[in-house]
């Protein structure tokens, strides 16, 4: 029976109501965090002489036993509502209410669960960052391998300009790099302590909030008690990051599906990430990319659901907030699975260099450089050059001839001239690529420089990540030893 019902409400509660309101199904995500929170709070109560050292030590020792036992071995009676009451009930069974009942002094489940969520989520954010770093490293290997592999870039999914496949991969690395930065920034706002805010107005007991902050490895405290128990913006921010990353990853999945089709035929997805048809024996379907693309789209829905739950809630704690948690954890685990799938597919793709080169050499992908050459060599305005080359392309299509066959005629009509060498260079797709060696360009030496720059950033990320993981591990070691 839930000990909270002995007073005001009485012991009777309908079974369907208990099952409807319990959060035990998803409280497994905060079980260890709740133990840490309990130990830190009890330690502080001892130090502040709010409870006796004797009682406090008994509580802490029993909490460590519960941690070793694991949540799955506890009495998960739905009438207990949540993991907080399950743990407190276990303590009372072993120590009696006169001892165990002192642990919750000066604390509410409101600040307790807010603390637990932050403790658990900070670990998951670090895990996500770790997976992203691994994926980024693998993408850089692919980019380096193909820094001279000629291909064509697209706008509107229409062939646009020559690039290298290494440069194309770096475009995704660049986006992932921003995602990593966003998660690191969010970590700082997750890692602040609401513990000590109590129900919503702190407490008359002489608590030391800075001490529990220190014990739990938080960077700071949320000072305002009402904000402390109600704030879930750190969850929304994390889920927004997850949604943005999911959108970036979905673009990769889309390219894997499209570029591996027979019509494009520029890459081949490894067999282990594909399936065949139940009726068409020739088929090699990009199922993993498709399923990943679909799963990533659900992340947007989870974010909107959480925002909708939170919209217009009265200030401080409302039980509605409980329903945020399953959407958060589903987003986290879906994202981690999808990162690993995308990483695996990118790391194992086969690149059809000949097909990529063939695509770059047709459909007028060098037209922009031809216009640029007219500007540089003939001194005309770019808009005029744009019109001349546009006319060349139009005539080439209509008359079914190569640009080389009619360019001299068109230039002469416009009182312009170019040497054959300049024309050949302008129309050569790889020469186009080599010319584009400005920062962020596709020239092989610039791609190589960019890869080196990203590797330097990764080294910094890894150091930062290792430092934060060590901080979290130290908290666990100190409190659970």
Swiss-Prot record:
**Reaction(s) this enzyme catalyzes, per UniProt:** 2-(N(omega)-L-arginino)succinate = fumarate + L-arginine
Q: What is its EC number?
A: 4.3.2.1
Q: Main localization of the protein?
A: cytoplasm
InterPro entries assigned to the protein according to its UniProt record, in alphabetical order: Arg_succ_lyase_C (IPR029419), Argininosuccinate_lyase (IPR009049), Fumarase/histidase_N (IPR024083), Fumarate_lyase_fam (IPR000362), Fumarate_lyase_N (IPR022761), L-Aspartase-like (IPR008948)
Record's GO cellular component, any one?
cytosol
Q: Which UniProt keywords apply?
A: Amino-acid biosynthesis, Arginine biosynthesis, Cytoplasm, Lyase
Q: Report the pathway entry.
A: Amino-acid biosynthesis; L-arginine biosynthesis; L-arginine from L-ornithine and carbamoyl phosphate: step 3/3
Question: Which GO MF term does the entry hold, naming one?
Answer: argininosuccinate lyase activity
Q: Where in the cell is it found?
A: Cytoplasm
Gene3D superfamilies per UniProt: Fumarase/aspartase (C-terminal domain), Fumarase/aspartase (Central domain), Fumarase/aspartase (N-terminal domain)
A Gene Ontology biological process term: L-arginine biosynthetic process
Q: What start-end ranges are recorded for coiled-coil regions in this protein? A: none
Q: What class of enzyme is it?
A: lyase
UniProt-listed PANTHER family: ARGININOSUCCINATE LYASE (PTHR43814:SF1)
Q: Which family does it belong to?
A: Belongs to the lyase 1 family. Argininosuccinate lyase subfamily.
Supply the name of the protein.
Argininosuccinate lyase
Q: Per UniProt, what is the name of the gene that codes for the protein in this document? A: argH
């Amino acid at each position: 029976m839930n000990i909270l019902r002995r007073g005001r409400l009485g012991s009777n509660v309908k079974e369907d109501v208990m099952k409807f309101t319990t959060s035990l199904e998803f409280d497994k995500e905060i079980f260890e965090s709740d133990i840490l929170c309990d130990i830190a709070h009890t330690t502080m109560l001892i130090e502040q002489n709010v409870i006796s050292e004797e009682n406090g030590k008994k509580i802490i020792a029993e909490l460590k036993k519960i941690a070793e036992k694991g949540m799955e071995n506890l009495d998960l009676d739905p009438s207990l509502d949540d993991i907080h009451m399950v743990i407190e009930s276990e303590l009372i069974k072993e120590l009696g209410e006169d001892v165990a009942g002192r642990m919750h002094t000066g604390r509410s489940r409101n600040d307790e669960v807010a603390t637990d969520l932050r403790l658990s989520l900070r670990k998951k954010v670090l895990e996500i960052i770790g997976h992203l770093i691994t994926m980024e490293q693998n993408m850089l290997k692919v980019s380096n391998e193909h820094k001279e592999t000629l291909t064509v870039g697209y706008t509107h999914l229409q062939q646009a300009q020559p690039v290298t496949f290494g440069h194309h991969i770096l475009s995704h690395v660049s986006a992932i790099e921003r995602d990593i930065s966003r998660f690191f920034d969010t970590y700082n706002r997750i890692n602040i302590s609401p513990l000590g805010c109590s129900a919503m107005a702190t407490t008359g007991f002489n608590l030391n909030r800075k001490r529990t902050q220190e014990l739990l490895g938080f960077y700071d405290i949320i000072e305002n008690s009402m904000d402390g128990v109600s704030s879930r913006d750190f969850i929304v921010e994390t889920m927004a990051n997850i949604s943005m990353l999911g959108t970036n990853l979905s673009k990769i999945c889309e390219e894997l599906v499209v570029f591996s089709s027979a019509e494009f035929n520029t890459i081949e997805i490894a067999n282990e990430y594909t399936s065949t048809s139940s009726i068409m024996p020739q088929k090699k379907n990009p199922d993993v990319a498709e399923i990943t693309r679909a799963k990533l789209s659900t992340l947007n829905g989870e974010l909107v659901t959480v925002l909708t739950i939170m919209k217009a809630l009265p200030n401080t704690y409302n039980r509605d907030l409980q329903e945020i948690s399953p959407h958060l954890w589903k987003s986290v685990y879906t994202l981690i699975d999808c990162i690993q799938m995308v990483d695996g597919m990118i790391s194992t793709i086969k690149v059809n260099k000949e097909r990529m080169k063939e695509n770059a050499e047709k459909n007028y992908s060098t037209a922009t450089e031809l216009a640029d050459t007219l500007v540089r060599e003939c001194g005309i305005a770019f808009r005029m050059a744009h019109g001349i080359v546009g006319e060349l392309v139009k005539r080439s299509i209509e008359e079914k001839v190569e640009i080389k066959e009619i360019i001299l005629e068109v230039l002469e009509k416009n009182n312009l001239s170019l040497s054959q060498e300049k024309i050949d260079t302008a129309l050569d797709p790889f020469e186009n690529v080599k010319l584009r060696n400005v920062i962020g360009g596709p020239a092989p030496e610039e791609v190589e420089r960019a890869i080196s720059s990203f590797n330097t950033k990764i080294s910094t990320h890894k150091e930062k990540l290792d430092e934060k993981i060590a901080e979290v591990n130290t908290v666990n070691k100190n409190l659970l030893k």
